[in-house]
Amino acid sequence: MPSPAGRLHRIRYIRLKKSSPDCRATITSGSADGQRRSPRLTNLLVVAAWVAAAVIANLLLTFTQAEPHDTSPALLPQDAKTAAATSRIAQAFPGTGSNAIAYLVVEGGSTLEPQDQPYYDAAVGALRADTRHVGSVLDWWSDPVTAPLGTSPDGRSATAMVWLRGEAGTTQAAESLDAVRSVLRQLPPSEGLRASIVVPAITNDMPMQITAWQSATIVTVAAVIAVLLLLRARLSVRAAAIVLLTADLSLAVAWPLAAVVRGHDWGTDSVFSWTLAAVLTIGTITAATMLAARLGSDAGHSAAPTYRDSLPAFALPGACVAIFTGPLLLARTPALHGVGTAGLGVFVALAASLTVLPALIALAGASRQLPAPTTGAGWTGRLSLPVSSASALGTAAVLAICMLPIIGMRWGVAENPTRQGGAQVLPGNALPDVVVIKSARDLRDPAALIAINQVSHRLVEVPGVRKVESAAWPAGVPWTDASLSSAAGRLADQLGQQAGSFVPAVTAIKSMKSIIEQMSGAVDQLDSTVNVTLAGARQAQQYLDPMLAAARNLKNKTTELSEYLETIHTWIVGFTNCPDDVLCTAMRKVIEPYDIVVTGMNELSTGADRISAISTQTMSALSSAPRMVAQMRSALAQVRSFVPKLETTIQDAMPQIAQASAMLKNLSADFADTGEGGFHLSRKDLADPSYRHVRESMFSSDGTATRLFLYSDGQLDLAAAARAQQLEIAAGKAMKYGSLVDSQVTVGGAAQIAAAVRDALIHDAVLLAVILLTVVALASMWRGAVHGAAVGVGVLASYLAALGVSIALWQHLLDRELNALVPLVSFAVLASCGVPYLVAGIKAGRIADEATGARSKGAVSGRGAVAPLAALGGVFGAGLVLVSGGSFSVLSQIGTVVVLGLGVLITVQRAWLPTTPGRR
């Protein structure tokens, strides 16, 4: 049973009119028609299987997968460490787990006044209400404590920090940004005020984003160039159609495969990956077709090559590209991982080159026009002309000079914030560092704030850090009012006020002397008066006693007489109808006056008793008066002796108090704005309403976590990666004792992003180096160690030279540093197109040598056969430059390196490889 392209072993290429440059070759078969049917059916089944696989795969993708969401940025890796840090920050402070930061900026024509705050508050409130697109808002300007951090130097702008939904550099973040800007546009206008959103470049920058029509344009141009290369190599239009059909089937199968591998996490580089996959697929299949044509041309009049003989030609381009792109699925940088995703398309193209491409060629039939050799030495033949060693050395020297700018290369992660509008109103780098400290205890007490102050001091000492916003430094700098030196200044003011009140006190003390003398005279007069009164009272008491005795005697006699008359009184009371009885009436007239006398005597006696009691009390009071007057005289004497001492003491204390007040005031002035005044915030100040906003925004809801924002100088580049470890070390040093012992430190923001990018780039650089060494080892196995080393050095030298020229162009001429992902992505694309160009040339030359013993002068050269990969790589790079519109984008930078690198690669191939001896 023949192979999927079993008919190929019976096809013979017959040269027609060998001397004519326009000759064509036709297919003839050495077998009978009956022997032809089974292989033809097999080839049809192969083609049908590919078509069915493409249709089924796309249908399954359509009905089983939801619409893909762009949740992965092109540069920021999402490793476990980053995810854990983001999760801890979001858990402590809900809504702030995103690294998509924006700033609300309210600008006025003049200095903002309190009457402008309602418009600012309305903008903040509107953003907080849009919970679908806004995670959290940190208000600065409305709080007097934090207002200095959110106010521009000229006082015309007020700022608030906004966390958007979605990760930086993703479509979700871009949609959130558009939404919040729309919210601000819907605010009622305020005269003289304008609200806008300022974002760091990393928030909304999607450097690898290509639109669908741009991708289609690049792929279409690549397909046209591939067809032109096929026609220039004297291949038929039918052969070009077979190449395009094979590429279409490969892409139709590769697209669902890539979707399955990547799932819903497409990322901003998905279209970029598909474009690269399409270009590499077209280039791979075109190169395989041209290599197969070269093999047939080299066969000459000998037996036609079998499928086994053609297998290296069909497999070599795809295998070389797949070896370099497939392992990039292990890359951590999303953009470079996207190149690995494009490698999936190359794997499918390799499979198509081994199956459906030979089948379509076989199905072309005997009447189809197939590859024929070119005559003469065309441009592909000239690529293989030997050159001198002097030329190789000269090329090496030029390459070394081109590499020199790499020495001063700067790695950028985002655009320089100083070039962004509104950057002058921000406290520092538009993307701050975030340090979250998680403790097992409540940190909302004076001791914990002292520890937070120590951490803030440590962090601001880290190189590049300008300001640190924390619960202890709410304005980004040491809080002067929350210090012992500031308290000393307030105490000095109080002492100064009290010292001024001592002068009237001394005057009053001096006047007390005369007052005491007057009081002493009055006491003497009182003493004399009391003595006279006491003597008079005693004399009156002597006259009162006989009167009281006589009154009591009269009362007694009256009582005794009443007892005698009681019988008569009782008879009168009990007599019936006394008024009509003469005797009873007469007795009653006698008794009634006497009763009146008895009643009067009783009242007289009672009054006498009261006079006696009052007299007794008066005598008792008057008797104690001399003693009380004596006590008053003694107290006055003590006061008289104390007043001079008090006057002397106050006069002596006044200079000391003034001196202490001056010393405390000078102490406060000397430590003002130094941050070394001894931080202290009392519990009363912690509970004060003026600190409420800081307490709520800088501590977690349970108080066990606090966050610090660090604003640094300069731009976000890979140099900031070192700051992440410095921040952890600095915070750890301040937490060896005190309230933050054994607390957990989490670093996020700019430093964490730079560190994650740096680690991912290092990992991916090592991965690319391993891949390159693997390719070199395989090339050495095919053609010898010298040729293998030449391939590796050639690709590396071409890349470094192109990178150096690009650095000179972008960094030194245009003042734009290369984005951090440009070197690796451009190297991956360059190597994917360049390594097959070099390796396939060596291998194709060996195949030709083994087939004929010598290369046919009229055949397409081995390097010329794989020229489509290099040419289409150049088309891809130039397309990236064009679709970026000539801007300073990452696509332009990648395209520049790729185009220059491929140009240098061709030069290196001409200068080095022909002079390199090979192993036979």
From Swiss-Prot:
TM spans (from-to): 44-64, 210-230, 241-261, 271-291, 311-331, 344-364, 389-409, 761-781, 790-810, 822-842, 864-884, 888-908
Family: Belongs to the resistance-nodulation-cell division (RND) (TC 2.A.6) family. MmpL subfamily.
InterPro entries assigned to the protein according to its UniProt record, in alphabetical order: MMPL_dom (IPR004869), Mycobact_MmpL (IPR050545)
Keyword Phosphoprotein: yes
Gene Ontology biological process: cell wall organization; lipid biosynthetic process; lipid transport; xenobiotic transmembrane transport
Transmembrane helix keyword on record: yes
Result of altering I611S: Leads to decreased interaction with PpsE, but does not decrease MmpL7 activity in vivo
Disulfide bonding pattern of the chain: none
Disruption phenotype: Disruption causes altered colony morphology. Inactivation increases mouse survival. Mutants are unable to liberate PDIM into the culture medium and are compromised for growth in mouse lungs, but not in the liver or spleen. DIM are found mostly in the cytosol and plasma membrane, and mutants exhibit higher cell wall permeability and are more sensitive to detergent.
Subcellular localization(s) per the UniProt record: Cell inner membrane
Binding partners and assembly: Interacts with PpsE.
Name the UniProt record assigns to this protein: Phthiocerol dimycocerosate exporter MmpL7
Processing after translation: Phosphorylated by PknD in vitro. Phosphorylation could regulate the formation of the cell wall.
A Gene Ontology term for the protein's cellular component: plasma membrane
Domain of life: Bacteria
Membrane topology note: Multi-pass membrane protein
Keywords: Cell inner membrane, Cell membrane, Cell wall biogenesis/degradation, Lipid transport, Membrane, Phosphoprotein, Transmembrane, Transmembrane helix, Transport, Virulence
UniProt GO MF annotations: fatty acid transmembrane transporter activity
Protein task: Required for export of phthiocerol dimycocerosate (PDIM) to the cell wall. Essential for normal replication during the active-growth phase of the murine tuberculosis model. Confers a high level of resistance to isoniazid (INH) when overexpressed in M.smegmatis.
